[in-house]
């Protein structure tokens, strides 16, 4: 008899709205580049990550593929051959959280390769690593700041390209590796280098709840869940289903979302004004703003989408002094947004005036 294991529902997490939003946006568009969650222990970081995996819809995979290949997307060499022969069978499975141990070696992460066998058999000679297991799942790194920098680079390269590439003695093997990357850390235990910080799409600082009612609600919900997980899960089932459907619809809408040239120029202008050198910042803001628009059921990006995206994508890319926490110059950002809105309103008024003039001219003809 199989015992059902219930995960604490995502929609039952009290507070931490910014963290939850950052996770949802990455679920809508993994190309955002993951999220770094900074905060002390006991602030629902790992609970939210596991709850997200349980919340997300099932994925379609190639049956028996060690890399969870998407039958409608990028395929490994084995699946390509199966597709050519018309033997590509598919199945569905739940997404899962793949944990990366702090002491993981490079071989454990990217996989091990038998060179002699690889020359003859190609990808079949690969002993899959964590990046194979993580493909189309959630890769979770707790205490990412304690991980070896080289391992972080390997992970972030794979996350950016969507492929894990293994090169040994002139032999090159690759397989799809696109995942939702989530790193958590306690800043009191050490910071990440700016070069590494920049590679994470979004960053969120989480703190303990300071509202008495919220803290009491957490106690009640955790006790209720521990006492009867099934009943508690069913209590939030409707909310879970609604959020799941909203994410599915946002994914479908994402490619239809457009952003105006005015907003693109504004994003780049803000990044320059704030002294952010990397172009990755601009690109991440655009991708995040589009995901926000899709999440809100729109096919166009607004200035409010851009503002919210900047609050998630820019703080960790700001220049700062040693031991100074990452933070965004909110006053400067607010000022620039107000200036943009005023200019936009002025431009719209001028357009309306020109329209009125054209109407009058046509009436006089």
UniProtKB/Swiss-Prot annotation:
GO molecular function: ATP binding; ATP hydrolysis activity
Pfam family, one: AAA_lid_2
InterPro entries listed in its UniProt record: AAA+_ATPase (IPR003593), CHLI-like (IPR045006), ChlI/MoxR_AAA_lid (IPR041628), Mg_chelatse_chII-like_cat_dom (IPR000523), P-loop_NTPase (IPR027417)
Residues in coiled coil: none
Keyword Nucleotide-binding appears in the UniProt entry: yes
Ranges of compositional bias, category Basic and acidic residues: 344-365
Top-level taxon: Archaea
CDD domains, A to Z: AAA (cd00009)
Binding site for ATP: 40-47
Biological source species: Methanocaldococcus jannaschii (strain ATCC 43067 / DSM 2661 / JAL-1 / JCM 10045 / NBRC 100440)
Name of the featured protein: Magnesium-chelatase subunit ChlI homolog
Similarity remark: Belongs to the Mg-chelatase subunits D/I family.
Keywords from the UniProt entry: ATP-binding, Nucleotide-binding
Region of interest called Disordered, as start-end residue ranges on this chain: 340-365
